[in-house]
Amino acid sequence: MNANSTTTAIGLTSPFEKLSFFPHSSNLILAHLHEIIFSFVFYQLAFSVVAPFLNKVVFRKHYTTIRDPLLKIDFNVHTVSMIQAVVSNTVLLPTLTTPMHYNVVTYTDSYSSMVSSLSAGYFIWDLTMCVRYFKLYGLEFTGHAIGSVYVMLLSLRPFCQPWIGRFLIYEASTPFVNINWFIMQCNAKSKNSIPLWFNVVNGLLLMTVFFVVRICWGSIASALLFRQMWKVRDELPKFSAVTMMSLNIFMNLLNVLWFKKMIRIAKKLAKPAPTSKLD
């Protein structure tokens, strides 16, 4: 099987392929536009309808008594993020069977394009939330959303499609990040409303998974991708290659920054509470 193998060689096809608005277009963004739109609408409905319902059922008074509208929005956004992490980690699994040595410039298949499109739809939604509530999410999350949208759309050039699932696997740490956030919000209102053991277990899983998939694998994957690009350097679209690697470096640095914050929080929580001396 050569490096330019297409979807027919490995049997990866999008289940939504027949719903395309532009089924005969050679432009992958147009061919998969329906998946981008579907994904955006899906997550908007999840934010507006599903998340509020789930939060009322799961968190009860911790959610229903919130008076700060921004905090309630943040609750809903974190719930949507949980849904997206489950969806993303499920749909990306078949893409991990795509050999890494396939040509990063020419390789594409219908299924990987679908994964990119569904992810692009989510990150476009995420970007709209970051812009709309910039005071809440700030420059870090907005920058992350912009970079993610760009990378997903760039993969529909096509570019680096064999690596889509291998970078989206970062989302494996997202559920633990969100659970940690929910625990902090619940305990802020009612101290120890979440058992300490549950908090500790989730915290350990969060730091372990985050370190493995985002710090370790993130660095290794970036190095391997750079090596793959170097092998086909004469074919590379220069601007796309430079921006892709720049964004990889940016994302890796951002992950290191977030991991350092986790360590600081963990150290703070591990410190025993000060006790007053009895005279």
Curated annotation (Swiss-Prot):
It is a multi-pass membrane protein. It comes from Saccharomyces cerevisiae (strain ATCC 204508 / S288c). Its main location: membrane. SMART domains: TLC. Pfam families: TRAM_LAG1_CLN8 (PF03798). It is found in: Membrane. One of its GO terms (biological process) is lipid homeostasis. The keyword Transmembrane helix applies. The chain crosses the membrane at residues 33-53, 80-100, 111-131, 136-156, 163-183, 193-213, 239-259. The gene is TDA4. This is Topoisomerase I damage affected protein 4. Keywords: Membrane, Transmembrane, Transmembrane helix. Disruption phenotype: Leads to cell death when overexpressing the camptothecin mimetic TOP1-T(722)A mutant. GO terms for cellular component: endoplasmic reticulum; membrane.
